């Protein structure tokens, strides 16, 4: 607001004029040439600007949840995956009676376009669904050899929310169903760039290796000094069952011919142990029958007694005189000491009288 000046005799307020600045005052002060040391100090003390200057374009959101009946190890694995994936969301456990296609509605309500669903059966078998909701495709795996972060206690470590590198085995590019799984894993597990909850650093790597017709997952820390890898965890193995065209259902695109269900595996192991038990019982029965059989007597071999020498016969001596009894020295000493004590007692009693 401009400055005003009031007249002395009650007149109206008049706007005061600002004093004019000279041309010399208008000029900025002359800058002193900074030395190299001052420039270095300014650079050192300067606060760097924000690292993330880009725009968040990849809006991938992953829903990670499970069915009822999971054990503690599955729950810890689910928490580890949520920690490693800042673009994930959680939800309550789904009831076993609900059909799997209901998960597409849950994803739509949570505004998620990808889903990792853990399905527990018989409180000992764990299945994992990877799905692109709502149009598919989706893949079903049997999860084996689970080791969580708290269980492993590895020396590796990474920043929470940092973006990972994804390393795939060359075998993923050889077969079409592995190529489809590779693209699905890339879209689900890779953290979007410039995500609000992510950190602009790359300090760990997810490795996917194919061995024995299974996918082995490992998480390693990248050390800055020599680019060495130190395992962080968790670790698990995915045994592929089927790939479906739709999300949680639809036509089957691929079925693993090498897959053996856990029920069949337990049945085979039980049959092997039963066969071993039956074999042991048969051996015992044969041994009992052999013991009951009469022993076959071999004919006497006359040549067996060729080198047998008869022992010398000692003459039999008959003792006619009764042997003298042995003297018991201890009993004899006791009797002597007993006599001496009695003699002393008599002498002492005579003196007192």
From Swiss-Prot:
UniProt GO cellular component terms: nucleolus
Xref: InterPro entries: Brix, BRX1
Biased composition annotated in UniProt, kind: Basic and acidic residues: 22-36
Gene designation: BRIX1
A GO MF term: rRNA binding
Modified residues (N6-acetyllysine): 276
Principal subcellular localisation of the protein: nucleus
Region (Disordered): 1-46
Protein name: Ribosome biogenesis protein BRX1 homolog
Classification via PROSITE patterns: BRIX
């Amino acid at each position: 607001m401009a400055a005003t000046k009031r007249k002395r005799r009650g007149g109206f307020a008049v706007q005061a004029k600002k004093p004019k600045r000279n041309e010399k005052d208008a000029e900025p002060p002359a800058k002193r040439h900074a030395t190299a040391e001052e420039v270095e100090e300014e650079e050192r003390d300067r606060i760097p600007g924000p690292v993330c200057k880009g725009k968040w374009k990849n809006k991938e959101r992953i829903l990670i949840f499970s069915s009822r009946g999971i054990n503690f190890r599955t729950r810890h694995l689910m928490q580890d995956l949520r920690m490693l994936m800042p673009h994930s969301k959680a939800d309550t456990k789904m009831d076993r009676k609900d059909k799997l296609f209901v998960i597409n509605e849950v994803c739509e309500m949570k505004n998620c376009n990808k889903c990792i669903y853990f399905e527990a059966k018989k409180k000992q078998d764990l299945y994992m669904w990877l799905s692109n909701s709502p149009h598919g495709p989706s893949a079903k795996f049997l999860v084996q050899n689970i080791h969580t972060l708290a269980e492993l206690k590895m020396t590796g470590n990474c920043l929470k929310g940092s973006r990972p590198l994804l390393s795939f085995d060359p075998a993923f590019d050889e077969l079409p169903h592995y190529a489809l799984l590779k693209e699905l894993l890339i879209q689900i597990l890779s953290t979007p760039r410039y995500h609000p909850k992510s950190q602009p650093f790359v300090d760990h790597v997810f490795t996917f290796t194919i061995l024995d017709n299974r996918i082995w997952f490992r998480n390693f820390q990248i050390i800055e000094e020599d680019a060495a890898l130190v395992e962080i965890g968790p670790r698990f193995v995915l045994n592929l069952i089927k790939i479906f065209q739709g999300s949680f259902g639809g036509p089957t695109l691929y079925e693993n011919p090498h897959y053996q269900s856990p029920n069949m595996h337990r049945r085979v192991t039980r049959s092997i142990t039963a066969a071993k038990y039956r074999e042991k019982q048969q051996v015992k029965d044969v041994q009992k029958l052999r013991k009951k059989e009469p022993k076959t007597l071999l004919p006497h071999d006359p040549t067996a007694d060729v080198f047998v020498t008869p022992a010398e016969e000692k003459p039999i001596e008959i003792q006619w005189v009764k042997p003298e009894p042995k003297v018991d020295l201890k009993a004899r000493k006791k009797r002597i000491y007993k006599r001496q004590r009695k003699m002393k007692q008599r002498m002492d009693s005579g003196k007192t009288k």
